[in-house]
Amino acid sequence: MESLPQPQNQSSPATTPAKILLGKYELGRRLGSGSFAKVHLARSIESDELVAVKIIEKKKTIESGMEPRIIREIDAMRRLRHHPNILKIHEVMATKSKIYLVMELASGGELFSKVLRRGRLPESTARRYFQQLASALRFSHQDGVAHRDVKPQNLLLDEQGNLKVSDFGLSALPEHLQNGLLHTACGTPAYTAPEVISRRGYDGAKADAWSCGVILFVLLVGDVPFDDSNIAAMYRKIHRRDYRFPSWISKQAKSIIYQMLDPNPVTRMSIETVMKTNWFKKSLETSEFHRNVFDSEVEMKSSVNSITAFDLISLSSGLDLSGLFEAKKKKERRFTAKVSGVEVEEKAKMIGEKLGYVVKKKMMKKEGEVKVVGLGRGRTVIVVEAVELTVDVVVVEVKVVEGEEDDSRWSDLITELEDIVLSWHNDIM
């Protein structure tokens, strides 16, 4: 990668001064551009970290009606930033005329470019990328976010060659559902499910599953399964399943693709189902597959501090981004226990397993010994923390630290804890 311009030495010839963005980032070369935004390589002045900065022209987005897409992209990336295979958003800044999205740098470029260079990928390589894609999309679906534009150009690679899903500008968030279904045609035709193009109400997760089937075909074959300059003819092929598998694709991979490219979304193989197949599980790096979300939340990392949007909210730009960065009040209860910290820990572990959470224990030292049990399910992480103030006094805090837990599950958890409660403190519901 090209290095960014360095401050010039007094003895060196005069050069164009590096452009410093709002005193925080040194802008480098352009990485790409579109009709209303461009992306630059940049370096953090504070940390020296290389990042990508998407520079969005406010006037163009307002005139073209693209502001809802910008809002969705920011909100989706904010919600999903803890998954290792989803491109992270670090910070949002703004001036009177521009919005700056500071994002993780995917220095490996587009997966699409890799496929173009090689023609097709070995099945083991294609499977690894597909595993990471499925993991990222399942994570987003569990948080109610459907991507709706899954294609190789939106699948980036970091310097280690790991997949990073990007461009959530067409994503649908839970509040955009009507009767549980989406109703807007989005995406790129060759990768878009037939029910989306027909503008019927559709399940965003099932539509993403279709796109994943096309992606897997492209990785293994080097071409799309349905390709016709006449869109109507292409969709007739889709409904007839009119495509052919090359001889080098394994029987298991063919079966998965065939089931994911089912034109009927009701009978189409879901991402959850494909992740249970033996083909998918082969060579799966389990530790990598499940890492990141759980550990980061058990360690009580801030869920909002990486995004600063005060400027966005206060500017008279026509873009109303207020509310995107207001952290919702999390469920939390506190009580004095009638048992020891160790017993609280064991009880929390037992309850978590009973109620279907993934359980992780941890011990920390503060002023006294602190027992921490993390309970994870989908996008939601709950922490049970027991602090031994004295030998006889143990205070326990139960709180949702990431995602949201529905009222019935939260009530079940609190009810299960009742038999170790000596007294409840003032509650934060």
UniProtKB/Swiss-Prot annotation:
Pfam families per record: NAF, Pkinase
Tissue specificity as recorded in UniProt: Strongly expressed in leaves, but barely expressed in roots, stems or flowers.
Posttranslational modification: Autophosphorylated.
Modified residues (Phosphoserine): S171
Start and end residues of each stretch annotated as PPI: 330-363
Enzyme class of the recorded protein, top EC level: transferase
Induction per the UniProt record: By sucrose, glucose and fructose. Repressed in roots by salt stress. Up-regulated by cold stress.
InterPro entries reported for this sequence: Kinase-like_dom_sf, NAF/FISL_domain, NAF_dom, Prot_kinase_dom, Protein_kinase_ATP_BS, Ser/Thr_kinase_AS
Catalytic residues (UniProt): D149 (proton acceptor)
Domain Protein kinase: 25-280
The organism's place on the tree of life at top rank: Eukaryota
Function noted in UniProt: CIPK serine-threonine protein kinases interact with CBL proteins. Binding of a CBL protein to the regulatory NAF domain of CIPK protein lead to the activation of the kinase in a calcium-dependent manner. Phosphorylates the rice sucrose synthase (SuSy) in vitro in an allosteric manner. Involved in cold response.
Protein name (record): CBL-interacting serine/threonine-protein kinase 7
Organism listed in the record: Arabidopsis thaliana
Gene label: CIPK7
